Amino acid sequence: MSALIEKHPFKPFLPPGCKVVLCGTFPPKPEKWSMDFFYPNFYNDMWRIFGMIFLGDKEIFFDRDKKRIDKEAIQKLLNSEKIGIGETVTEAIRTRDNASDKYLEVVKMVNLPELLSKIPDCNHFVTTGEKAAKVIASLTSTLVPEVGSKTECEIKMENGIIKKFYHWRMPSTSRAYPMKLEKKAEFYRHMFEEIGII
């Protein structure tokens, strides 16, 4: 029996005037979702970090009783701050029945020129984990940045123009990543400050 190739379930969310796009690898299986949007697992810390940084409340997007995440409120914030969300992997095989990047076999990577052509004001690409960072480093023939740092990259666009952008590597927002929520939030806050979002 051949391995099942899965397509990424979400299309990139790219607000008009998007200045930065955050990209991970692959979401968990649908039975683990608390909404149908990026970082859908109730126990992933991405939207807690956003709540802390932008609204001063890490639980503002979470309904603990219903185990739901407020997608509409998140998208409203992303639109307001001109922050995009996408992926580095568009097709993958789960070699084990979980969401760990360790057991994710990349089949197809994001088409960077195509993605960046949709967001001409964006000069910052943020990866939210080691595997995502390695994908972008591979696509741009650059070194993988250290956590919290950035690398300058160049990519040849579909029209032949060379576009420069910065690849930032942030800590994974998975609970399995050994770093306290507050420390993760410090990395993300610094990155948003450097970019000029906050």
Each predicted region: which residue ranges?
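C-terminal capping/extension of enzyme domains
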Residues: 1-12, 16, 28-31, 40-42, ...
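Internal catalytic-core helix/loop-beta-alpha segment
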Residues: 80-139
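Short, well-ordered loop/turn elements at secondary-structure boundaries
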Residues: 16-17, 121
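Structural motif
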Residues: 19-20, 124
